[in-house]
């Protein structure tokens, strides 16, 4: 094996765990970001909390616009046909009004890592 090739293999082996760790969502950071950015309108508690947006417990797997105790959905979101998977949430949160024109959702999370962290946190919220 040539010196350059050996150096490349060693560098890849050393860097691989660090790159994988950097790519993993940070659920605690997602929770903190949620509390700062999203918690103003959305609740993640069984009862109580803000009601400008729907409660997000169990959001992953739920059809958009279908939270039974929330009545402020836009017609656009109800008609979107979206089922909230982590992939769908990630796409939506980049720019909600571009993904679903007419949505009432005012916030976006343009940063990929921050958005991945928030989506990972939301995925932990089971009913």
Q: Whereabouts are the PLM-identified features?
A:
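Bacterial N-terminal signal peptides that target proteins for export
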Residues: 1-11
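Hydrophobic h-region of N-terminal signal peptides that target proteins for export
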Residues: 12-21
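Stable alpha-helical elements in mature extracytoplasmic
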Residues: 26, 33, 37, 52, ...
């Amino acid at each position: 094996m040539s010196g350059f090739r050996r150096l490349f293999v060693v560098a890849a082996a050393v860097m691989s765990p660090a790159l994988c760790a950097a790519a993993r969502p940070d659920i605690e950071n997602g929770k903190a970001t949620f509390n700062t950015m999203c918690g103003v309108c959305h609740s993640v508690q069984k009862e109580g909390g803000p009601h400008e947006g729907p409660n997000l417990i169990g959001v992953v797997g739920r059809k958009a616009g279908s939270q039974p105790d929330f009545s402020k959905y836009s017609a656009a979101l109800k008609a979107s046909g979206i089922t909230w998977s982590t992939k769908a949430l990630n796409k939506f949160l980049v720019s909600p009004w571009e993904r679903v024109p007419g949505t009432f959702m005012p916030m976006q999370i343009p940063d990929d890592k921050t958005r991945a962290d928030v989506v990972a946190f939301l995925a932990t919220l089971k009913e």
